[in-house]
A protein has these predicted regions:
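Alpha/beta-hydrolase active-site loop
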Residues: 100-118
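Gly/Ala-rich beta-loop-alpha elbow adjacent to hydrolase catalytic centers
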Residues: 126-135
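Conserved alpha/beta-hydrolase "acid-adjacent" motif
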Residues: 287-293
Length: 341
C-alpha cells in the first residue's frame, strides 16, 4: 500500500497543477443563504414555523454539500421536509482557498457553534459521513445545545471495525499525508484526492445501484441521474492542510474521539456527556465507514438506553444519503423520530 501511494504521489507531483476554476454546485430544493461564515455558507431550506431547527452537518471530505440535496427523490433535505421537519438548514462548507490552508478542526467547530447560536441556541443535529464525527464532537463539547442527534455513516470508533478507508489511513505513514498537503501548497487539492481514492466505481450499474433507481438503467431518467452523479463526483472540493492532517492523525490513526483524547475548542471532550436522544444509521455494505465503527458510539455516549436508536440498512455508503429507497423509508422514519424527541 505504501509503495503504491508513493508512486501515485510521485505521479501527481510530476503532473500539472489542478484547475482552480470552481463550478457552482446546483441545488435541488429552493433555499437561501442565511449566514456567511469563513468556513461555510449556511443554507436555509425553511418552510417557516416555530419548530426547532434541524441542522444537517454535511461531510467535509472530498465533495460539496449538494450530497444532501442531490436530485428529486434523492434529496436528504427533501426527505426530512416531507416527513414533517419544517426548519432545515445545511452547512455548505467552502472549498478551501489558499487563505484557508491553516483552518483546523476547531475552526469548523467554532463556526458550527455560531450557526447553532444563530438558530436559537439549541438544534437537532444530523451528522452525515465525516460531518457526523464533527457533529458528535460538537455535541460532546456543547451537550446542552443539542435537542436530538443523528449520526449517519459517521466514523466514531475506528478500531471497532475495518473499512477500506480506515485500512488506508492506518497503512499510510503520516509523511504520506504531509506530502499530499505539500503538493497543494498547504491545502489538499480535491483533484489529487480524487485520483488517489477511486471509490465508488463510476460504471453505470454501480451508480444505478447506489442511487437505488427503480427505472431501467437505459431510460432517459436514469441517464440524467448518471450524468448528474458523474458531474457531482468529478467536482471535488479542496481541504485545508491543517484540518486534513488532524483528521488523518487524530480521528483515524490515534482514534482520539473514541478514547477520550480529543480536544475541541480548548478542552478535552468526553462522549459520555452526550446524554440526549441519538439515532445511529449505518450501511451494511459501507466501504468508507464499517457499521461497527459507527455503532460503537452506542457504548460511548451517556444517553439512556431508551434514547438510543440504531439501524443498519442494506446499501453502500453513498446509498445512505442518495438512495431513493433509503431516503423514502429510513430517513422519513428518522425525521418523525426527531420531531417526537
Amino acid at each position: 500500500m505504501v509503495s503504491v501511494l508513493a508512486k501515485e504521489l510521485a505521479h501527481l507531483a510530476a503532473g500539472h497543477s489542478p484547475n482552480s476554476m470552481v463550478r457552482e454546485p446546483r441545488w435541488t430544493t429552493p433555499n437561501r443563504i442565511a449566514l456567511e461564515l469563513p468556513s461555510m455558507r449556511l443554507r436555509e431550506f425553511s418552510a417557516g414555523g416555530d419548530n426547532i431547527a434541524t441542522l444537517v452537518c454535511a461531510p467535509l471530505a472530498l465533495h460539496d454539500a449538494t450530497l444532501t440535496d442531490f436530485a428529486p427523490d434523492h434529496s436528504l433535505v427533501a426527505a426530512l421536509q416531507m416527513a414533517g421537519l419544517g426548519n432545515v438548514f445545511v452547512t455548505d462548507w467552502r472549498s478551501a482557498s489558499p487563505e484557508m490552508r491553516f483552518f483546523s478542526i476547531d475552526s469548523y467547530l467554532a463556526d458550527l457553534n455560531v450557526v447553532v447560536d444563530e438558530l436559537g441556541g439549541c438544534a437537532n443535529l444530523v451528522g452525515v459521513c465525516q460531518g457526523g464525527g464533527m457533529a458528535l464532537a460538537y455535541a460532546a463539547r456543547y451537550p446542552n445545545k443539542i435537542h436530538g442527534l443523528v449520526l449517519a455513516g459517521a466514523p466514531v470508533d475506528i478500531n471497532a471495525g475495518e473499512s477500506e478507508l480506515s485500512r488506508v489511513a492506518h497503512s499510510v505513514p503520516t509523511s504520506g499525508f504531509k506530502q499530499l498537503v505539500e503538493l497543494g501548497d498547504g491545502r489538499v487539492r480535491g483533484a489529487h484526492l480524487l485520483q488517489l481514492w477511486k471509490h465508488p466505481p463510476l460504471e453505470p450499474e454501480a451508480i444505478h445501484g447506489l442511487l437505488q433507481v427503480s427505472d431501467d438503467i437505459a431510460t432517459p431518467h436514469s441517464s440524467r441521474l448518471l450524468t448528474l452523479f458523474r458531474e457531482w463526483y468529478t467536482r471535488p472540493i479542496d481541504l485545508p492542510g491543517t484540518y486534513y492532517l488532524q483528521v488523518a492523525q487524530w480521528l483515524y490513526k490515534d482514534n482520539r474521539l473514541a478514547t477520550g483524547r480529543f480536544a475541541a475548542l480548548g478542552r478535552p471532550i468526553d462522549l459520555s456527556m452526550v446524554r440526549g436522544p441519538i439515532f445511529l444509521l449505518a450501511a451494511r455494505d459501507d466501504e468508507i465507514v464499517a457499521p461497527e465503527q459507527l455503532l460503537a458510539a452506542r457504548h460511548l455516549v451517556g444517553s439512556e438506553e431508551g434514547q438510543i436508536r440504531t439501524e443498519t440498512v442494506a446499501c453502500t455508503h453513498l446509498g445512505l444519503f442518495l438512495g431513493a429507497t433509503t431516503l423514502l423509508h429510513t430517513w422519513s422514519k428518522i425525521a418523525r423520530w426527531l420531531a417526537a424527541c
